Each structure stands twice: as C-alpha cells, then as structure tokens.
Amino acid sequence: MAERPSASRQKAYRRGHRGEWLAAAALMLKGYRILARRHRTRFGEIDLIARRGDLVVFVEVKARRSLMEAMEAIGHESERRIEAAADIWLSRQADYGRLSMRFDMVAVLPWRWPVHVENAFYGRN
C-alpha cells in the first residue's frame, strides 16, 4: 500500500497547481493558447506549453516570494531537462518545420499578478 504524502508535500502540490493555473490564465490573456500542462517525458516535465501563431513557448512556472528568487530557481540542470523534453514534444508535431520556440518563465508572486519573463533562458538551438 502506498504511503500518503506528507501534509507539507500535499500543500506544495496544491500550490504548484494553483500557480500553474494562474500562469496559464495570464498567458491566455496575452493571446496564447495552452497546448499542454505538466507534459511528462522520459527527461522530465514541462509545466506549460503554449502557442501563439507559429511560436511555441515552453514555460517553467515558479511560485516564489520575489522575481529574483523565481529566476534563480531555474538552474542549468532544469534548463537541460526542459530543453530535452521540448525537443521530444516538438519532434512529434506535424508542423515542426515552421515552428519557432522560446523558453519562458512565469513567476507567481504573493498578492501580485503573475510575471511573464520571455526568453528566461536560451536553448542550445
């Protein structure tokens, strides 16, 4: 029988879902269409995949106390994981050849509207 997650882990999970919901809402208000949430691959998970026109945006959502903390929370290992997962997702798209991609971050801060940071990091492509 599987153990129940601790109360703090459950709270973090709920906070993550709320943050991703807020981030998705902020992106939709900017004209993006959400294609996937918590997209899992063998390399890891992409929080949100959004599209506007021929631009596909792979979004890492960070709920932190400040924008600086959110930016610092994306390390090189996270970048590599997101890039590898993005490559897999893109390769499965029929219109792969005409799509542009970008790696963004949405910071979910206390009592503020989410902050969308375009080009939070640059992929190796």
Curated annotation (Swiss-Prot):
Signal peptide: none
A UniProt-annotated Pfam family: UPF0102
InterPro entries listed in its UniProt record: Restrct_endonuc-II-like (IPR011335), tRNA_endonuc-like_dom_sf (IPR011856), UPF0102_YraN-like (IPR003509)
GO molecular function: nucleic acid binding
Similarity section: Belongs to the UPF0102 family.
NCBIfam families on file: PRK12497.1-5
PANTHER family named among the record's database cross-references: UPF0102 PROTEIN YRAN
Name of the featured protein: UPF0102 protein mlr4633
Organism (species): Mesorhizobium japonicum (strain LMG 29417 / CECT 9101 / MAFF 303099)
